[in-house]
C-alpha cells in the first residue's frame, strides 16, 4: 500500500505541475486515475473511485477523437464507472460504462495490443447489466467480447489470465440462466486455466481461485460428485490464504468454502468461517471513513452468525466449549464499528502517569480518528491551505490510523499493557454477568439459538421455531400493524391492528423469550419484598427490530390457571449491542462531581416540517422536568405563533447542545427523531437547525463525555436500524449516546404518541428522583420497567402505546 500511495502522490503532483494544454496531460491523468482505481479495488474507498473517474474523464475529454491513446482513456472511464455501479447500483453509471468501453473497442484496430483489454472492460460492464436487468443479449455480447479478448492474446501474455477468468464468469452466469451443462464445464476449464497461469503470490490469484471454486461448487450442487466438492473447497480455501489479496476477496472465499461444507462437515465449515470473521477488521479498518466501512461490512452481513451457528452444529466438539466459542464469534464479528471506537476509550490514568508522551500521542490520534474525515485530516496535517480533495483526505486518514497502530504496538510492549485496547476475551466478558445474565440471540438459516452468559459460564438454548423466514414475516407484520394502529383514517380498524401487535408479542414470547427465561429459572415474578432480577438482551440482527422486553401474553396474565407469561412480569429488561458494549457502559458509572446538572432539549415546534411538526405535549413535558430535575438548563424552540422569543444560546441547535453536554449529568430530548432508511449513521434528532447542521449518529461519534449518566431520547425510533444489511452493527441514536459516554440511555423502537410519551417521562422521573431532586440514575432500568408495566396494566389492549420504550446500557 505504501507503493500505491506513493504512486498516487507522484501522479497527482505530475498532473498539478502540467499546464492544461500540455500534450502529456492526458497520459498523466490516465496514470493517476489507474492508480486511484487500483487503490479503490484494494480498500473500497469511494473517494478514490470518484477521483479515478474524474481523472479518466478529463483525460478522454482533452484528447482529440482521432488520437491513438483516446481508447485507453475511454476504457479507463468505462472500468471506473462500472466499479461505481457495483458500489451504488446507479444504472446510469453502468450504461455510460458500456458506452465508453464500446467506443474504446470501436476506435481500436484489430491488431492493436490493447484491444483485448478494452474488450475485457466491455465484457465486465455488459455482464453487470445482465445481472441487473436479465437481458440475455447483454450476456451473449459479454461472452463474445471475453472470448475475443482471449483469442487475440498470446498464451504467455500476463493479462491472459484476466480474460480467461472473465470468460469463465460469463459462462457460469449463462449456465445459471439457461442450465446448459456444457457452459458450466467450459466455465470451469477457463477458470482453472486462469489460476494455472497466475503466480501463487499474485493478488489477483485469489479472485481467479474464487471464480473456479464458485463454478465447481455449482457443479457439485447439480451433480453431487464429491471430487467437485473437494476441488471447490480447495480452491476457495487457497483463495482465502492469498495474503496479498484484498481482505474482502479472502473473506468471501472463506465464507463460500464454509457454506459448501456446512451440511457435511460443520466442524471444518465453522473453522473456515471463523477465519473469515477474524479478517473482518481488515475489511473495514479504522482508517476508512464511516460510510465506506458500512458499505463494506454490509456486504458481509450475517457472517458472524453463520460462524456461530456452525460452531453450535458441530456435535463432534465438546458441548461445554461450543457455546463459549460461538459467543466469542458473535462478540468479535458484530458491532465492529462501535467496538473500534470503544476499544480506544478506556481508562488512561495509569498510562498518563507512567508514560505521558505515549498517552498524549495515543489520545491525539484517537481523537483524530473519531472525527469526521474532513475535520480529522485538517487537524492531522495542520495545513492552512485549501481543503484537500476527498481521495487525499482518505489517504491521510489511513496514515493517522497507521501511526495509531504503531503507537498501540509500543504501548502493548510495555509491562502490564499487553491487552491495551484489545477486544475483551470471553473470560473477560463473564464478569459482566454479575448483575444479571446477558442473552445473545443468533437467528440463522443453519440454526437459531440463544446464548446465555451467567456467572457460571456460557450455555445455549436451541430455538428451532425462530427461523429467519418466520422472523422476517413477523417483523413485517408487526410494523404494518403498528402503522395501522395509528392510522387516522375514519374507517381504519385500529383495534384489529392492536390485536395483531398483541399476537406477535405472544409469538415472540413462545419462540424466544419464554425458552430463555425458563432456562434461566425466571418462571414468575419475584416474591413480595424481593428485588426484581435484571436481564440484558443482546438481540443482534433481526430480533433488534422487535421488543423482546414486551414479549408475552399480556391479556392472559390474570386469567385463572395462567402463569405470568410476559417478560414484564418476570424480569427488568435492558439492552446492549454486545457484552463488550455493556462492559464499556459500566466503565462510565463512577459518580459524577456534585452537583448534578440536567439539559432539557424541547422541540414543541420543528422548522421545516409539515405544520411545524407540532408536539403539543412537549411543553408540558419540559415544564415537569424543570420542576423535578436538578439544575435544569432548558433549550426550547420558541412559538412562532406568538411574540415569544428566546436568546440565541437558549435555542436548541446542535452547537448549543454540544456546548452543554460536557458538563451535564442528564440529557433529555423531547423532539422528533428520524431513523435513516439506508445510512443509519445519518439517523438524527430533529433540532432547530436539523436542515443545516443535523445532530446525527455520525456527529456524536467524536463526543467522549466524563460526567454523563443518563440520556432520555423522548423521540421516535431512536433505537431502530432500518438497513437490513447493517442490523448487526446496531447503528442508531441510542448506541451513539452510549458511545458518547452515557451508561444509561432510554430509546424507542418505533413512532411514539406525543401525549403518552410525556406521561411516560413524568412517571419515569417520578420513580427516579426524591423530594430533594436527587436522581439515582443507576435505577433507570427499574424506573422504566415499573413505568411501562404500570401503563401496560392500564392499557393491555394497546401495546403500541407502551412497548416502544427501552433501557439500554449498564
Q: What kind of feature is each model-predicted range?
A:
Residues 1-210, 218, 223-225:
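Thr-biased low-complexity repeat/linker tracts and other Thr-enriched repetitive architectures
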Residues 18-27, 44, 63-72, 89, ...:
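Acidic, Ser/Thr-rich low-complexity linear motifs
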Residues 573-584, 665-774:
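Catalytic cores of nucleophile-dependent amide-cleaving enzymes
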Residues 757-810:
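An often Trp-containing, charged/polar helix-loop segment at the C-terminal end
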Amino acid at each position: 500500500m505504501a507503493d500505491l500511495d506513493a504512486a498516487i502522490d507522484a501522479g497527482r503532483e505530475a498532473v498539478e505541475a502540467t499546464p492544461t494544454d500540455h500534450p502529456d496531460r492526458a497520459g498523466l491523468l490516465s496514470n493517476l486515475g489507474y492508480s486511484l482505481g487500483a487503490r479503490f479495488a484494494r480498500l473500497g474507498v469511494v473517494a478514490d473511485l470518484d477521483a479515478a473517474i474524474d481523472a479518466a474523464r478529463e483525460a478522454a475529454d482533452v484528447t482529440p477523437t482521432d488520437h491513438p491513446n483516446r481508447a485507453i482513456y475511454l476504457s479507463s472511464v468505462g472500468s471506473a464507472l462500472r466499479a461505481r455501479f457495483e458500489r451504488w447500483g446507479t444504472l446510469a453509471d453502468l450504461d455510460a460504462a458500456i458506452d465508453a468501453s464500446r467506443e474504446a473497442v470501436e476506435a481500436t484496430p484489430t491488431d492493436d495490443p490493447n484491444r483485448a483489454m478494452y474488450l475485457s472492460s466491455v465484457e465486465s460492464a455488459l455482464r453487470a447489466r445482465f445481472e441487473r436487468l436479465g437481458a440475455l443479449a447483454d450476456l451473449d455480447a459479454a461472452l463474445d467480447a471475453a472470448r475475443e479478448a482471449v483469442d487475440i492474446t498470446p498464451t504467455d501474455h500476463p493479462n491472459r489470465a484476466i480474460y480467461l477468468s472473465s470468460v469463465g464468469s460469463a459462462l457460469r452466469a449463462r449456465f445459471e440462466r439457461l442450465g446448459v451443462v456444457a457452459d458450466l464445464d467450459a466455465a470451469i476449464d477457463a477458470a482453472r486455466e486462469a489460476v494455472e497461469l497466475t503466480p501463487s503470490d499474485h493478488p489477483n490469484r485469489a479472485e481467479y481461485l474464487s471464480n473456479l471454486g464458485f463454478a465447481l461448487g455449482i457443479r457439485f450442487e447439480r451433480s453431487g460428485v464429491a471430487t467437485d466438492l473437494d476441488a471447490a473447497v480447495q480452491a476457495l480455501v487457497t483463495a482465502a490464504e492469498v495474503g496479498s489479496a484484498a481482505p474482502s476477496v479472502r473473506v468471501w472465499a472463506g465464507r463460500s468454502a464454509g457454506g459448501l461444507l456446512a451440511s457435511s462437515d460443520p466442524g471444518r465449515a465453522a473453522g473456515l468461517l471463523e477465519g473469515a470473521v477474524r479478517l473482518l477488521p481488515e475489511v473495514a479498518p479504522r482508517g476508512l471513513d464511516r460510510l465506506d466501512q458500512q458499505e463494506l461490512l454490509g456486504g458481509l452481513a450475517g457472517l458472524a452468525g453463520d460462524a456461530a451457528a456452525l460452531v453450535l452444529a458441530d456435535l463432534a466438539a465438546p458441548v461445554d466449549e461450543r457455546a463459549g466459542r460461538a459467543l466469542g464469534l458473535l462478540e468479535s464479528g458484530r458491532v465492529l464499528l462501535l467496538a473500534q471506537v470503544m476499544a480506544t476509550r478506556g481508562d488512561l490514568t495509569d498510562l498518563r502517569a507512567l508514560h505521558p508522551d505515549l498517552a498524549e500521542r495515543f489520545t491525539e490520534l484517537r481523537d483524530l480518528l473519531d472525527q469526521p474525515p474532513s475535520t480529522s485530516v485538517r487537524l492531522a496535517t495542520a495545513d492552512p491551505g485549501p481543503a484537500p480533495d476527498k481521495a487525499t483526505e482518505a489517504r491521510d486518514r489511513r496514515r493517522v490510523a497507521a501511526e495509531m497502530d504503531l503507537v498501540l504496538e509500543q504501548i502493548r510492549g510495555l509491562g502490564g499493557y499487553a491487552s491495551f485496547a484489545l477486544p475483551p476475551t470471553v473470560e473477560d466478558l463473564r464478569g459482566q454477568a454479575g448483575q444479571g445474565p446477558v442473552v445473545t440471540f443468533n437467528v440463522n438459516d443453519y440454526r437459531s439459538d440463544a446464548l446465555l452468559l451467567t456467572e457460571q459460564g456460557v450455555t445455549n438454548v436451541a430455538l428451532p421455531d425462530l427461523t429467519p423466514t418466520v422472523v422476517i414475516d413477523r417483523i413485517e407484520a408487526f410494523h404494518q400493524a403498528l402503522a395501522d394502529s395509528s392510522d387516522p383514517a375514519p374507517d381504519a380498524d385500529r383495534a384489529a391492528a392492536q390485536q395483531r401487535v398483541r399476537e406477535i408479542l405472544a409469538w415472540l414470547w413462545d419462540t424466544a423469550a419464554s425458552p430463555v427465561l425458563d432456562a434461566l429459572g425466571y418462571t414468575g415474578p419475584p416474591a413480595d419484598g424481593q428485588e426484581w432480577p435484571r436481564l440484558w438482551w443482546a438481540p443482534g440482527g433481526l430480533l433488534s427490530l422487535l421488543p423482546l422486553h414486551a414479549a408475552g401474553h399480556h391479556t392472559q396474565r390474570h386469567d385463572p390457571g395462567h402463569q405470568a407469561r410476559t417478560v414484564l412480569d418476570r424480569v427488568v429488561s435492558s439492552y446492549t449491542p454486545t457484552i463488550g458494549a455493556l462492559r464499556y457502559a459500566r466503565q462510565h458509572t463512577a459518580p459524577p462531581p456534585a452537583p448534578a446538572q440536567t439539559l432539557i432539549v424541547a422541540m414543541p415546534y420543528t422548522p421545516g416540517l409539515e405544520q411545524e411538526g407540532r408536539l403539543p405535549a412537549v411543553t408540558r413535558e419540559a415544564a415537569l422536568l424543570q420542576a423535578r430535575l436538578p439544575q435544569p438548563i432548558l433549550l426550547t424552540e420558541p412559538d412562532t405563533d406568538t411574540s415569544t422569543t428566546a436568546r440565541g444560546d437558549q435555542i436548541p441547535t446542535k452547537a448549543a447542545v454540544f456546548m452543554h453536554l460536557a458538563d451535564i449529568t442528564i440529557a433529555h430530548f423531547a423532539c422528533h427523531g428520524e431513523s435513516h432508511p439506508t445510512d443509519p449513521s445519518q439517523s438524527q434528532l430533529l433540532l432547530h437547525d436539523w436542515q443545516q447542521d443535523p445532530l446525527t449518529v455520525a456527529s456524536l461519534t467524536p463526543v467522549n463525555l466524563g460526567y454523563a449518566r443518563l440520556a432520555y431520547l423522548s423521540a421516535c425510533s431512536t433505537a431502530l436500524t432500518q438497513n437490513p444489511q447493517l442490523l448487526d452493527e446496531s447503528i442508531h441514536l441510542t448506541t451513539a449516546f452510549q458511545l458518547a459516554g452515557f451508561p444509561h440511555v432510554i430509546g424507542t423502537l418505533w413512532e411514539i404518541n406525543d401525549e403518552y410519551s410525556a406521561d411516560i417521562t413524568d412517571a419515569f422521573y417520578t420513580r427516579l428522583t426524591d423530594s430533594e431532586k436527587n436522581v439515582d440514575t443507576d435505577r433507570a432500568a427499574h424506573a422504566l420497567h415499573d413505568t411501562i408495566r404500570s401503563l401496560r396494566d392500564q392499557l393491555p389492549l394497546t401495546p403500541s402505546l407502551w412497548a416502544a420504550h427501552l433501557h439500554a446500557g449498564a
